[in-house]
Amino acid sequence: VSGQGTSGTAVQGGTETVSATPTTVATNVSAEPSANTSPTQSSQEASAVLTNANQVTPAVPVQSETVTEPAHEGQTVDMQILSTTDLHTNLVNYDYYQDKPSQTVGLSKTAVLIKKARETNPNTVLVDSGDTIQGTPFGTYKALIDPVAQGETHPMYKAFEMLGYDAETLGNHEFNYGLEFLDRMVKGAKINIINANVRNAQTGDYYYNPYKIVNKTFTDTDGKQVTLKIGITGVLPTQILVWDKANLEGKVTVDDPMEAVKAIVPKMKAAGADYILVAAHSGIGDNEYTKNEENEGYQIAGIEGVDAVATGHSHADFPNGDGTSFYAKYPGVDDVNGLINGKPVVMAGKFGDHLGIMDVKLTYTDGKWKVVNSKAKLEKIDTKSDVADKDLIDMAAHDHNGTINYVRKEVGETTAPITSYFAQVQDDPSIQIVNNAQLWYAKKQVAGTADENLPLLSAAAPFKAGTRGDATYYTDIPAGPLAIKNVADLYLYDNVTALLKVTGAQIKEWLEMSAGQFNQIDPNSKEPQQLINSSYRSYNYDVIDGLTYKFDLTQPNKYDREGKLVNPDASRVRDLAYQGKPIDLNQTFLVVTNNYRATGNFPGVKDAAEKRLLNLENRQAIIDYIVSEKTINPTADGNWSFVPNITNADIRFASSDNARAHLSGQDAISYVGPSTQAGFAEYRLVVKEKANQVEDTTKKESEKSPKGVEMTDQTKRETPKATVGASVAKPAPTIQLSNAQVVILPQAQVQETQGSSSDKALPNTGSDESVSATLAGLVLMTLAGFFGIKKHEKN
């Protein structure tokens, strides 16, 4: 089959046809193998912790070379579509943060299910819905420490090739290491990488192949072979232009996902597609549509001509199969049979923990293949067994071992455990350490500049806080030696430090947005009330250190989870003070944060007068800080709390059952009992009256503030100042980012400590090398992508 897309002529070869060729990055425009192969890794290189695992051979992809007879009237085929998503470099079944094997993650585990499914029905299509090459220290290692070179294949894409994936679409996190890095990964891949809504900003052409027609030879119900032309396309959220603004601005544009699919389906039909599958890096969303929404899976399933949708991005599971899915409440959602708007839809969780399976019966009628019936389901990996795919483990062994050596490098020690079990309900050491490190680093970066005397604050959020129903998704670092794996557990994402110049009024709006983390509490109710808004992502709950403040939870949230103003007169932020005095809403502050926040649309941030992207990852700043301090005493300064007008309320929240071991000294938190969610428990928070309240001195300030800004009592306590070094940074040239100034500061000037070396030294996993020399090299490794290496979304 050949056809013409909007940006190029189709390329035909072997058993597959590329339906459109982008002008910028070509992926697999020939069916012939590429010369860009990765060296085969020996099984003897496999980590010792894995050699005793029970292993199986990899699933063998269905071959499509057989010459078949044309389809005939009444011919019936039973096809299955297999789907993975949001693998986030979980290739080997290993937890790099805990430094031990894990049976709850890994494509090496999912591959066992893929083989089983193909044995059940060889008429199989296999796709992935994105967020593949970023997410664990394995991803960091292959991007920054031992980066995949030009012409090499990323281990994740090599695994897809080995398993016979028919196509993969890109996710938002694919862009975290910069467009140049992604271009190199796409060119080195020997699988079909597709996307239909990212365009070249200069030409308007598709940046990637917008779709692929894959000729699949299936066996019909009578045992005869027949070829079907499966059209596969993919889309991702338009929000990548915000999340990776520094990487993408002026280089690409992004079409609305639903509109992009609507536009490409007729082209796929014209190219001969018998069946159209959308691999959407998009959550399911809901039944209400607004253009450029982050999650449009529901709407995509309703597009005429779309036959099936493999969703992702939200790290959720669909279908549940019993009508209990979160999405079951929406019209047109059949959670029992896995249908949305009459089409089979799956979302296969995250990290390889599920395989999506869509079963489709097709009959050839009136010259076309027509769907007779469809259904979808999820199959969970076997978490009780260590069975994994041997060939994938062998292929990844060299990079897997390199990652382990990298994360085991010691950088300091902690006198007490560092956990995030209670980081959403009280000021917490896990966030305090990040803020202390950011202040330590930023102070040196502004020393000797015109902004040297501006008040300096720091913002950080709890990244691992049981997000999306995962009771294992918390930071849990034991007392004792601290290694890079622990810092990666503490600071999950490959963000880059950034400085914002904002006013006191903007800081208040920033905190109002953060306060969306909490549900509104009725102070008069005697019924249990849940404190945490589960729909709000914990990585958006910024704690700003250098100030003191309280949250009034009797008030509604001012902004929704997307940052949209929903209650203009609401004011949850009270007693906002700097150095013990009510904050001046007109005063200018510097806030050190990360590039994800700095380039986003967060209230109070998006209108910052100046945004400076620095030259060092946040994680590396933490490493350097720990190296400098040598020993960390994990305590929080208690700079925020709740207004004590809910002291009689029964306030509950969920956290891991493992948090029970850390209740000692937590006089405001108590264990209630097990949760209905596996691995979680319910806890009670008691908000106590605070002593030493002082006279309300904020009235004059609030009179100057915009409508809705209200601040009352003030505490006498002065926020502790961070200990900083004495290095001096020179002013740097300025460039423009949107309407704000962006200053590229000189390469990070890390204070010299005993045993340190030149910051030009590359990272080294040898135990005899200096820790500082080993880690300072990450600065240079980061330079190529520092403009926007960031987190995601995760969702």
Q: Where are each of the predicted segments found?
A:
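Functionally constrained cores in energy, signaling, and assembly domains
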Residues: L50, A117, A167, K216, ...
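Short secondary-structure boundary micro-motifs
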Residues: T66, G151, A167, N197, ...
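Intrinsically disordered, low-complexity segments of exported/surface proteins
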Residues: V1-K100, G106-V125, S129-E152, Y157-K158, ...
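Acidic, metal/ion-coordinating pockets
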Residues: V67-K380, T449, L456
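Catalytic centers of hydrolytic enzymes
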Residues: V77-Q80, N90-Q98, Q103-K115, E119, ...
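Short glycine-rich loop/turn motifs that provide flexible caps or phosphate-binding loops at active sites
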Residues: V105, S129, Q134, L170, ...
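Generic signal for short, ordered secondary-structure residues
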Residues: V67, Y165, I240, N247, ...
